[in-house]
Amino acid sequence: MKKSVDRRSFLKLSGAALGIGVLYQAMPAAQAKGAVGEMFDHMGKQTGERPTPFSFVQLSDAHVGFNGPPDPLGTKAFERAVEMVNALPERPELILFTGDLTHDTEEKDVHAQRMKQFLEISRRLNVPLIKCVPGEHDAGLDGGAMYREFLGESSYSFDHRGVHFVALDNVSRAKPEVGKEQRMWLEKDLARFPKSAPIVVFTHRPLFDLKPDWEWFTSDGDEVMNLLSPYENVTVLYGHIHRDDAHELGHVHHYAARSLIFAFPDPEKAPDKKPVPFDKEHPFRNLGIRLVHENFSGQPLVNAAAIEDVELTAREFSGINGMQQLLKEPEL
Amino acid sequence: MKGKVVAGALMVVLAVFMASPRGARASEPRVIEIHAKRFGFTPDQITLKKGETVKIRLVSEDVTHGFFLRPLKIDEEVSPGQPAEILLTPGQTGTFTTICDHFCGVNHGNMKMTIVVSE
């Protein structure tokens, strides 16, 4: 017997690109019954928490310590982002920071100072939970030693309100790769979940060949995706490319957040990977700093150039009710 | 009988000895040496012919570098004192950007060179 599910009432994950980052809302149906309810119950048993509504923000690529022509304002955009997140009408429960928290330097003392400055600014966030992964500028020169000293492990997982979050490190081996050891850990980590479990992977580099000659790839990304693809509700959030991007590969959706320092151009249009020049009249334009309307689900953002609204809705996968993200065009 | 066998074996060895150096020289690929040093390659452009096998000899002058070019399936690393060799027979024409994909410092993102493959 085919089960009937109200696709829009199942679970909604909406993402609004703030420019300063991305705000997501996970909205599982409060009264989910039948197969969906059973799945939620199962998730509740696995994670100790049944999926319930919450919101979180993705921030990326602050490059604390960078101060050059593409952005002579240093940490101003990062600090502005913190203010904006704190001003959101609905307080997010979680921040995911997808790498390049700091800009690299070979002077260890200076890099340590940059790590401290990152922590000082990020602690101003009025958000109970902040989770990070490193970028190559944090961890590429020392195999992630200093990153781990300040921020802990670079790959790990945790559960939040029934959603399984996985932090993947694809920078600490200096090459753009996850590596066999971490892939084995990932496979084991995922094994306890049903195939319909909602999973959010956050990492620094794209896990697919977005633009390999700009180093926008992960060399063993296909092997990672082979581990993730049996799961029907996987979202991958990443940074590194300093611009919005949305890709759907199979049933997995990949989203990049903008940076907090400078933007890179569209690789399909620009001949070279050169930062978008700084505009002193509009210092945050290329970072897309935007104000968020109180009701971001139905109202447009102010001064926005590109808004993403992503919904997780119910979908049947091989007879199992799962979730799928749908990317909506901006409603401006 | 034993003497004939030894003589035959000697002739075979002699034939191989005489033939091999010429044959090896005739089929040895062209060697192109590329030096990697933060944050560039020297030379920064080489031109190859489609179907011609070449040997790229990579030498690092400072730290570990990568040498990555997805379309031609090149993914190599080179460390100081340990040159790397790549046998390459390009199967397609075009202009390709090869990058260092082993993070090597602040301007790592700009470390690249061009490989042109012509007919």
Predicted regions span which residues?
Chain A
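Short acidic, glycine-rich surface-loop motifs adjacent to enzyme active sites
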Residues: 194-210
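Catalytic metal-binding/acid-base residues of hydrolase active sites
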Residues: 16, 63, 101-102, 137-138, ...
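Hydrophobic membrane-targeting alpha-helices
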Residues: 22-30
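N-terminal active-site segment of His-dependent metallophosphoesterases
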Residues: 30-112, 188, 210
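Active-site neighborhood of phospho(di)ester-bond hydrolases with catalytic His/Asp-centered motifs
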Residues: 59-60, 95-99, 130-136, 202-203, ...
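Extended active-site neighborhood of metal-dependent phosphoesterases/phosphodiesterases
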Residues: 38-48, 106-198, 216-235, 247-258, ...
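N-terminal secretory signal peptides and thylakoid transit peptides that target proteins
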Residues: 1-21
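C-terminal/domain-terminus segments
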Residues: 303-331
